[in-house]
């Protein structure tokens, strides 16, 4: 059974500006494992990855029902690409299944997270 759906659209340039303006922005958003994956990219692809993780975590927080804040932080959620590049939620406070999807244009990233209970 679906427990929550979260959708987010983020401007890639906005995330790029935040990362440039705030020296700890990337470390604030990405877990150490996500940072490892991020470090494998360069140029526009690294910005897309960062914006994608920001947006995926926002989508997760919306599906979870709390938003990002006092009860749920960016490091409480970890989303790693599998060998095919699909985002997989590897860490979260949610005990059921979490399904994630991400898509980019040249300027935007759109994400969706669906939280599903283990009992169908």
UniProtKB/Swiss-Prot annotation:
The Gene Ontology CC terms held by the record are:
cytosol
Gene Ontology molecular-function annotations: holo-[acyl-carrier-protein] synthase activity; magnesium ion binding
Task: Give the chief site where it resides.
Answer: cytoplasm
E.C. number(s) listed in UniProt: 2.7.8.7
Q: Does the keyword GTP-binding apply?
A: no
Q: What class of enzyme is it?
A: transferase
Q: Where in the cell is it found?
A: Cytoplasm
What would be one Pfam family of this protein?
ACPS
Keywords linked to the UniProt accession: Cytoplasm, Fatty acid biosynthesis, Fatty acid metabolism, Lipid biosynthesis, Lipid metabolism, Magnesium, Metal-binding, Transferase
Respond yes or no to whether keyword Metal-binding is given for this record: yes
Cofactor(s) named in the record: Mg(2+)
Task: Quote the record's binding site residues for Mg(2+).
Answer: 8, 58
State the reactions this protein catalyses.
Answer: apo-[ACP] + CoA = holo-[ACP] + adenosine 3',5'-bisphosphate + H(+)
Instruction: Fetch the InterPro entries from UniProt.
Output: 4-PPantetheinyl_Trfase_dom, 4-PPantetheinyl_Trfase_dom_sf, ACPS, P-Pant_transferase_sf, Ppantetheine-prot_Trfase_dom
- Please name the GO terms of the biological process aspect recorded for this protein, alphabetically: fatty acid biosynthetic process; lysine biosynthetic process via aminoadipic acid
Question: Hey, which family's this protein in?
Answer: Belongs to the P-Pant transferase superfamily. AcpS family.
Q: What does this protein do?
A: Transfers the 4'-phosphopantetheine moiety from coenzyme A to a Ser of acyl-carrier-protein.
State what protein this is by name. Holo-[acyl-carrier-protein] synthase
